[in-house]
Amino acid sequence: RAILEGSAELIKEGKKAFPEIMIPVVCDVAEFRNQAELVKKVYPDVLAKYGLKKIPYMVGTMIEIPRAALLADKIAEEAEFFSFGTNDLTQMTYGFSRDDVGAFVPGYLAKKIIPVDPFQILDQNGVGQLIRMGVERGRSSRAGLKVGICGEHGGEPSSVMFCHRVGMDY
């Protein structure tokens, strides 16, 4: 409601507003649909409150759970865009808690168990394959699906290059 009302206020001031409402941490299309319905439910109320005929908006999701990447084709049937939350996706793929990595990742790096800290540099072989799969599957059911990255990896050059190679928009 707050996002739509803020957008309505901008429109009433003569400004453009086109919010992209992102539903986080979904694992299934049914869960996404359930949350997207909440947006659809308040939309007419906001229009009436502000005397508007339309507020353009999109509803998408963060792909942060490995299961969501695997089911991206189904989720994209409903979601209008994806943003890959690479911090949580890395955590859930590895089973590492970000709160505890300082206690063991330095040892893993020293022993060459892992080549880099996966929370600093995107693991292209594991997490990256979930991302590639999610992008491909999402676009297989929604051509032109807007896809991007959200997380610390978005500021790391090799991670950004990988995201560009798999076809992300941002």
What do these predicted regions represent?
Residues R1-Y170:
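Conserved alpha/beta-domain cores
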